[in-house]
Amino acid sequence: MTYLRSIGLSLLVWTGLFLLNGCAPQNEFAVEESEETVTITTENYQLQVEKGGFRYRFEGPEGDVIAPAHPESGLQMGPSSGSLAAVTSATLEERTDSAVVFAAQTDGGLEARVRVRPEPHAVQMAVRPKEDGQYDVVGRTGGLSPSYGLADHAAFGGGAWDEGVRPRPELTGFEMDPLRGYRMTSNFVVFPQQGFAEVNVEPGDKVVRLTETENLQGSRSVRSMPALYYFVGSPEQIYQAFLEVRNREGFSVMTPKYEWFGVGWEAFGALSWNTTQETVTENINQYLDFGFPLEWMVIGSGFWPSGEGEFDEHGTPYGADAQSRDADALLATTSFGMWDEQKYPDPEGMIDSFHEKGLKVTIGLRNGFIPGGPFTEEGIKNGYFMKGENGEAKLFEVGFPEPDVYLLDAENPEAVDWYMDFWQKWADYGIDGYKEDLFGYPDSLPDDFFDPVNEAMMKDSVYVMGRNNYLGSPVDIHRYNDFNYNQPQDRGPINGLAFAYSGFPNVYPDIVGGTGLATDRFGEAPESKLRTYLMRYAQYAALNPSMSFGYGPWNYGEEVVEVTREAARLHDRLQPYIYSNAMKATETGFPHPMTPLPLAYPNDPQVYGLADTTRRSYQWLIGKSLLATPLYGDDYARAESRDVYLPEGTWMEYDSGEVHEGPTTLEDYPLPVGKTPLFVGGSGIVVEEVEGELKGRLYPIADQAETLFYDRDGETQSTITVAGPDWEDPTVIDQSTGEEVPGTWRRHAYEFTLTPGHDYRVE
């Protein structure tokens, strides 16, 4: 199934090929044809196509092989009702200023045109069979490894989302046809060691095969495969080119908002279904009284009109029969401005009070409409819901709510506008944003079925926490699947790293403590284990781009409060630094807020075997200056140390200030509960917020360094340059005023007050 989004890519049909309508970067290239090959040469790579089998390989400027040709053929095609056949011959038909066009034919006589368009660090292949119809089309090279990406699929593989976990984010051996089944979907794959990557832009059925002998991506049941991209270059160059492709193809990467990168709170984790104005207010106040620096909150459960006592503390809504007609109609988050009046007697006053405390208030929201609901008939009448083969609005079984629902047709711009009008009912109460969390829907839906709604919300400055997504980033932060104590704990860091590899670095690792502690709905666990679980989870989450809390740590004693609060305060201090790196990711595509080490050090062989369920050295860079080394995984309750790998350079322990020279492995490095699992290195420049002031922190790591800092508005910039200072007595000059800025040594760094928009030089 292939269709055009209402936004983004505009396609024209010309000589039987899809052509991009503007926007594509131009690239100078030379074409050389021999009897057997066609060679396309650019400044950065060479693409050699063998006419027999359309076998293609990528080489570097010096002739080194980057990606080998497939041993049989580069393309396979066939009618969707049949089997794939290898392309056996290809001829050069045309060379234009922007592309090279081939005529290709399979051994069964199927003909197609193949348009190859070189870009500075990318190649687009568009394959269109000559005759109308529905086809399966794949492109393939020889095998490459190691490989990374695929978002949720890299964490779960083909396993159940709440039980399975792949042993590592590395993908060799992964095969799925079609690629489906999870909510956060990307078929972008990167090979850092080779300086290579690929993606077949297709929200419908996709094929991915990554074996020792074959690297394959393709589309099922399509008229054409117009956007198979290969990328060549350094990781930074690859992700910049991938960003341009995502935005150009209509899968936008949008500017995130600052507050989401602070510490949050979720009602479902804290209270399960027992949410009322009173319980929500009380729980938030408890966190604030204990000194937790909350900045955002989600009321995602139990706020809609319901029957008396329907969702009490130990109830479950998934199989519950509604006790009133209203509850039956509104057993979902699409109640749009309709609160349970007994549970939430003054929602506007409640929201105002949270705003006065400095919190952004968000609500749970999905796109499913229940038959008999107050807005459903209007949606059916106007054709705003997804339709079945008979052309009528279709009911879908989903994970929540219990009744089957109609799903918004987000490819219909009028339906999205209608939905946005309903959203305004929440905004009128002062709600700042929403948590998108539809699940359990048929995996036959296109992967981008929710993206246009999220994009419309973001354009309207709504705060959006996303879960369902394909390829782009039309949200502020990306949450991975519910992460509870009864599940494999290695899945969390593998999931987060896979998001980052896939170009989704604004990772939110779900609620510290998950969603089961308030009710024991996942079974009981020893309290001593749960105490350790909360502390380890908090320390792990604090080093992610966003974090939140649910069930109160005070329920498990003073030590748990102290450790989790310190983790929250660490994240709060680092929020400006994390957000600045999120802005860099938005501008460059490179996953700066959470950088897997193979992307930062692609030529270091030691970084490729760290993250797996045996070694559990789950490490990543936060920007250029911080190395996260959390102790997490299935052994969280018993482990006290990890083998920590420090890449090339000088690294300082965050707590003690002890210095190490890399590359080196700190074997059995002690990481007891409460120790900050963080090293400072790289540029040694970090910006923190302390008591409402921005502080530039200069660690004596590098004598020559520079960093660009984005303030909370995402636009105001400051450059900090370290230029051979005397670390015994450094001098900071505000280059915007020419004045010296006073500073002091604090926590192993020289610290000064930073004014947003001013540039600084350290001498």
Task: Annotate the PLM regions.
Residues M1-L11:
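Bacterial N-terminal signal peptides that target proteins for export
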Residues A267-F268, V298-G300, L359-G372, Y434-S444, ...:
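Aromatic-lined carbohydrate-recognition surfaces of secreted/lumenal glycan-active proteins
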Residues T37-Y258, F268-L271, Q277-E278, I284-D289, ...:
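Catalytic and substrate-binding clefts that recognize carbohydrates or anionic sugar/phosphate headgroups
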Residues G372-K381, P442-D451, R467-Y501, N506, ...:
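Substrate-binding cleft/loops of secretory-pathway carbohydrate-active enzymes
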Residues V475, Y501-P509, G516-T737, R746-A749, ...:
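Catalytic core of carbohydrate-active enzymes
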Residues P256-S444, P474:
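Aromatic-lined carbohydrate-binding/catalytic grooves of carbohydrate-active enzymes
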